[in-house]
Amino acid sequence: MIREEEVFKIGQFAKPHGIKGELSLVTNSDVLEDAEDPYIVCEMDGILVPFFVEDFRYKTDTVVLVKLEDVNSEEDARMFVGKEVFYPLDAVDEEDLVGDMTWDSFIGYTVTDVQKGYLGEITDVDETTINVLLRVDHKGEELLIPAVEELITEADHEARSLTVSLPEGLIDL
Protein backbone atom coordinates (compact mmCIF):
# COMPACT_ATOMS: atom_id res chain seq x y z
CA MET A 1 0.00 0.00 0.00
CA ILE A 2 1.30 3.46 -0.92
CA ARG A 3 1.60 5.92 1.98
CA GLU A 4 1.19 9.69 1.75
CA GLU A 5 4.79 10.31 2.84
CA GLU A 6 6.05 8.22 -0.12
CA VAL A 7 4.66 10.62 -2.75
CA PHE A 8 4.61 14.32 -3.53
CA LYS A 9 2.03 16.37 -5.41
CA ILE A 10 2.88 17.25 -8.99
CA GLY A 11 -0.44 18.70 -10.10
CA GLN A 12 -4.12 18.11 -10.67
CA PHE A 13 -6.23 16.60 -13.43
CA ALA A 14 -8.44 19.28 -14.99
CA LYS A 15 -10.59 17.59 -17.63
CA PRO A 16 -10.68 14.87 -20.25
CA HIS A 17 -9.10 15.66 -23.60
CA GLY A 18 -10.76 14.05 -26.58
CA ILE A 19 -12.65 10.75 -26.57
CA LYS A 20 -9.81 8.22 -26.10
CA GLY A 21 -9.25 8.70 -22.37
CA GLU A 22 -6.57 11.39 -22.31
CA LEU A 23 -6.56 13.79 -19.37
CA SER A 24 -5.27 17.34 -18.97
CA LEU A 25 -2.77 17.44 -16.11
CA VAL A 26 -2.06 20.94 -14.80
CA THR A 27 1.51 20.88 -13.46
CA ASN A 28 4.79 22.73 -13.23
CA SER A 29 6.70 19.49 -12.85
CA ASP A 30 8.72 17.69 -15.51
CA VAL A 31 9.22 14.42 -13.63
CA LEU A 32 7.46 12.33 -16.29
CA GLU A 33 10.09 13.29 -18.88
CA ASP A 34 12.90 11.46 -17.10
CA ALA A 35 10.94 8.37 -16.04
CA GLU A 36 11.59 5.05 -17.78
CA ASP A 37 8.25 3.50 -16.78
CA PRO A 38 6.29 6.46 -15.46
CA TYR A 39 3.36 6.08 -13.16
CA ILE A 40 1.36 8.57 -11.15
CA VAL A 41 -0.66 8.16 -7.99
CA CYS A 42 -4.19 9.42 -7.28
CA GLU A 43 -6.37 9.13 -4.21
CA MET A 44 -9.37 6.96 -5.00
CA ASP A 45 -11.91 6.29 -2.24
CA GLY A 46 -9.37 7.27 0.42
CA ILE A 47 -6.59 5.02 -0.91
CA LEU A 48 -3.53 6.09 -2.90
CA VAL A 49 -3.63 4.10 -6.14
CA PRO A 50 -0.90 3.91 -8.82
CA PHE A 51 -1.78 4.35 -12.50
CA PHE A 52 0.70 3.61 -15.25
CA VAL A 53 1.23 6.32 -17.85
CA GLU A 54 0.83 4.91 -21.35
CA ASP A 55 1.76 8.15 -23.07
CA PHE A 56 2.01 11.88 -22.43
CA ARG A 57 2.68 15.05 -24.39
CA TYR A 58 2.87 18.73 -23.53
CA LYS A 59 -0.01 20.92 -24.63
CA THR A 60 1.42 24.06 -22.98
CA ASP A 61 4.17 24.80 -20.45
CA THR A 62 1.81 23.86 -17.61
CA VAL A 63 -0.62 21.39 -19.21
CA VAL A 64 0.40 17.82 -20.03
CA LEU A 65 -1.98 15.51 -21.86
CA VAL A 66 -1.72 12.15 -20.12
CA LYS A 67 -3.01 8.77 -21.31
CA LEU A 68 -3.30 6.31 -18.44
CA GLU A 69 -3.29 2.54 -18.93
CA ASP A 70 -6.84 1.08 -19.02
CA VAL A 71 -8.45 4.53 -19.27
CA ASN A 72 -9.81 4.30 -22.80
CA SER A 73 -12.77 6.66 -23.07
CA GLU A 74 -13.89 10.12 -22.10
CA GLU A 75 -16.25 8.48 -19.60
CA ASP A 76 -13.36 6.54 -17.98
CA ALA A 77 -11.33 9.76 -17.80
CA ARG A 78 -14.10 11.74 -16.08
CA MET A 79 -13.55 9.87 -12.80
CA PHE A 80 -10.13 11.58 -12.56
CA VAL A 81 -11.36 15.17 -13.02
CA GLY A 82 -10.29 17.33 -10.08
CA LYS A 83 -8.07 14.61 -8.60
CA GLU A 84 -4.71 15.67 -7.24
CA VAL A 85 -1.84 13.86 -8.94
CA PHE A 86 1.14 12.57 -6.99
CA TYR A 87 4.48 11.07 -7.97
CA PRO A 88 6.57 8.56 -5.99
CA LEU A 89 9.54 10.01 -4.11
CA ASP A 90 11.63 6.90 -4.75
CA ALA A 91 11.34 7.41 -8.52
CA VAL A 92 13.20 10.73 -8.39
CA ASP A 93 16.82 11.45 -7.47
CA GLU A 94 16.87 13.36 -4.16
CA GLU A 95 19.08 16.11 -5.58
CA ASP A 96 16.63 16.69 -8.45
CA LEU A 97 13.51 16.73 -6.32
CA VAL A 98 13.33 20.31 -5.05
CA GLY A 99 13.63 21.71 -8.55
CA ASP A 100 10.78 19.54 -9.80
CA MET A 101 8.33 20.28 -6.99
CA THR A 102 5.93 23.18 -7.03
CA TRP A 103 5.77 25.32 -3.90
CA ASP A 104 2.25 23.93 -3.27
CA SER A 105 3.89 20.56 -2.70
CA PHE A 106 5.30 21.91 0.56
CA ILE A 107 1.86 22.44 2.18
CA GLY A 108 1.83 20.31 5.33
CA TYR A 109 5.61 20.39 5.76
CA THR A 110 7.00 21.50 9.12
CA VAL A 111 9.42 24.43 9.20
CA THR A 112 12.40 24.72 11.54
CA ASP A 113 14.76 27.70 11.65
CA VAL A 114 18.45 26.99 12.33
CA GLN A 115 18.50 29.72 15.05
CA LYS A 116 14.93 29.88 16.42
CA GLY A 117 14.01 26.17 16.19
CA TYR A 118 10.54 24.85 15.30
CA LEU A 119 8.38 27.52 13.64
CA GLY A 120 5.24 25.63 12.60
CA GLU A 121 3.53 23.97 9.65
CA ILE A 122 3.06 25.34 6.14
CA THR A 123 -0.68 25.84 5.71
CA ASP A 124 -0.79 27.56 2.33
CA VAL A 125 1.28 29.16 -0.41
CA ASP A 126 0.59 32.72 -1.59
CA GLU A 127 1.48 33.16 -5.25
CA THR A 128 -0.45 36.41 -5.73
CA THR A 129 2.59 38.59 -5.06
CA ILE A 130 5.82 38.96 -7.02
CA ASN A 131 7.57 36.85 -4.39
CA VAL A 132 5.94 33.53 -3.50
CA LEU A 133 5.26 33.32 0.25
CA LEU A 134 4.90 30.24 2.44
CA ARG A 135 2.14 30.72 5.02
CA VAL A 136 3.21 29.08 8.29
CA ASP A 137 1.01 28.59 11.36
CA HIS A 138 3.42 29.92 13.99
CA LYS A 139 1.94 29.64 17.50
CA GLY A 140 -1.54 30.42 16.20
CA GLU A 141 -0.35 33.41 14.16
CA GLU A 142 0.41 33.51 10.45
CA LEU A 143 4.09 33.81 9.58
CA LEU A 144 4.98 34.65 5.97
CA ILE A 145 8.28 33.23 4.74
CA PRO A 146 9.62 34.12 1.28
CA ALA A 147 9.79 30.93 -0.79
CA VAL A 148 13.32 31.35 -2.04
CA GLU A 149 15.82 28.53 -2.19
CA GLU A 150 18.52 30.74 -0.63
CA LEU A 151 16.65 30.63 2.71
CA ILE A 152 16.08 26.86 2.67
CA THR A 153 19.09 25.01 4.06
CA GLU A 154 17.55 21.52 3.97
CA ALA A 155 14.46 19.85 2.54
CA ASP A 156 13.65 16.39 3.91
CA HIS A 157 10.85 15.10 1.69
CA GLU A 158 10.42 11.81 3.51
CA ALA A 159 9.96 13.58 6.86
CA ARG A 160 8.05 16.40 5.12
CA SER A 161 10.14 19.11 6.76
CA LEU A 162 12.09 22.21 5.76
CA THR A 163 15.00 23.72 7.63
CA VAL A 164 15.44 27.43 6.95
CA SER A 165 17.93 30.13 7.83
CA LEU A 166 15.82 33.27 8.14
CA PRO A 167 17.28 36.77 8.33
CA GLU A 168 17.32 38.36 11.79
CA GLY A 169 13.99 40.01 12.60
CA LEU A 170 11.85 38.31 9.93
CA ILE A 171 9.97 36.24 12.49
CA ASP A 172 9.23 39.35 14.56
CA LEU A 173 7.50 41.23 11.71
From Swiss-Prot:
GO terms for biological process: ribosomal small subunit biogenesis; rRNA processing. It comes from the Bacteria. Residues 98-170 form the PRC barrel domain. Disulfide bonds: none annotated. It is found in: Cytoplasm. InterPro entries: PRC_barrel-like_sf, PRC_RimM, RimM, RimM_N, RimM_N_sf, Transl_B-barrel_sf. The keyword Cytoplasm applies. SUPFAM superfamilies: PRC-barrel domain, Translation proteins. One of its GO terms (molecular function) is ribosome binding. Keywords: Chaperone, Cytoplasm, Ribosome biogenesis, rRNA processing. GO terms for cellular component: cytoplasm; ribosome. NCBIfam families: 16S_RimM (TIGR02273). Belongs to the RimM family. An accessory protein needed during the final step in the assembly of 30S ribosomal subunit, possibly for assembly of the head region. Essential for efficient processing of 16S rRNA. May be needed both before and after RbfA during the maturation of 16S rRNA. It has affinity for free ribosomal 30S subunits but not for 70S ribosomes. The PRC barrel domain binds ribosomal protein uS19. Binds ribosomal protein uS19. This is Ribosome maturation factor RimM. It comes from Parabacteroides distasonis (strain ATCC 8503 / DSM 20701 / CIP 104284 / JCM 5825 / NCTC 11152). The gene is rimM.
